[in-house]
């Protein structure tokens, strides 16, 4: 069994569109099929664009909280307002960046992307777990194959140069593998080890999809070895309470 990754070429999208139909069209145009057990990894930004989750600077009205955030962290006022709207928790930050959480996703600036949006702000997709679930179900109904779906974003890792992929949502696969009670190479019983299956696969696909102008918003992973499931996955399964997170607890000292 050899893991393979097939990037899916697309054309640039700037407005709302039917995500599922576009995925089907692109997979066919790229000469790829989705087989039983494949994992389809989709860019979170691509999904956001399909939903129209784009803010024009001119449409953003400022709040006092946005003014405070802008002053404290030297952030553009319009971006500050978007961060306030999109965040459940603001942990702190540095000049130009605010560390936030929204729907159990911890990210700088609420995951808002302004790198390729021509002066506009691209927000995280609405209900990403529901989106992943719907795509998985539609592929089964139309093609009678069980596939996994991962929605990927790129993320900075603490004290590391560069970005890597992270799963902000998934469906059809078990997102975490519990390795507790198994043994390591020396025969020691593992007591706390969980393997982040969805995140690991997201990072593999993200490497092939790229971060620039590649126009590769999707990739298909074959022979991943991931465990398939029909149950509905929730964000709580891939996140831990912040009072148990070593990074958050360490920064609060």
Q: Locations of the language-model features?
A:
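N-terminal and secondary-structure boundary signal
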Residues: 1-253
